[in-house]
C-alpha cells in the first residue's frame, strides 16, 4: 500500500468520525489540537481504521500517535 493511499483512507475515516473538512486532515495535523478530537473520538477513529484496513491496533501501539502522519506510519506498518 502506498503512503498516499493510506492517507486518503485515514482522511475518509477522520472526516466521518470527527466531522472535519478533508483539507484539514494533513500529515502534520494533530488529532487533539488541530482536529479537536477527544479520547472517545480517537477510539472511534481507531475502530474505523481497524475495520477499513482489517487490522488490529492494540492500545500500546497508539502511544506516540499524535498526528495523522503517525497514524499513516502505523497503518503502513500493520498492513505491511
Short names for language-model regions:
Residues 33-52, 70:
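Phosphopantetheine-attachment site and its flanking helix in carrier
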Residues 9, 16, 39-45, 61-64:
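Residue-level recognition of specific faces of alpha-helices
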Residues 59, 63-78:
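C-terminal structural segments of small proteins and small subunits
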Residues 1-23, 77-79:
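Thiotemplate assembly-line natural product biosynthesis machinery
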Residues 17-36, 52-64:
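Phosphopantetheine carrier-protein modules
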Amino acid at each position: 500500500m502506498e503512503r498516499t493511499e493510506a492517507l486518503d483512507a485515514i482522511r475518509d475515516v477522520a472526516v466521518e468520525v470527527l466531522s472535519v473538512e478533508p483539507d484539514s486532515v494533513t500529515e502534520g495535523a494533530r488529532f487533539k489540537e488541530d482536529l479537536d478530537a477527544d479520547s472517545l473520538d480517537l477510539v472511534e477513529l481507531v475502530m474505523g481504521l481497524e475495520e477499513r484496513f482489517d487490522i488490529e491496533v492494540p492500545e500500546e501501539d497508539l502511544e506516540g500517535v499524535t498526528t495523522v502522519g503517525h497514524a499513516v506510519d502505523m497503518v503502513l506498518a500493520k498492513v505491511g
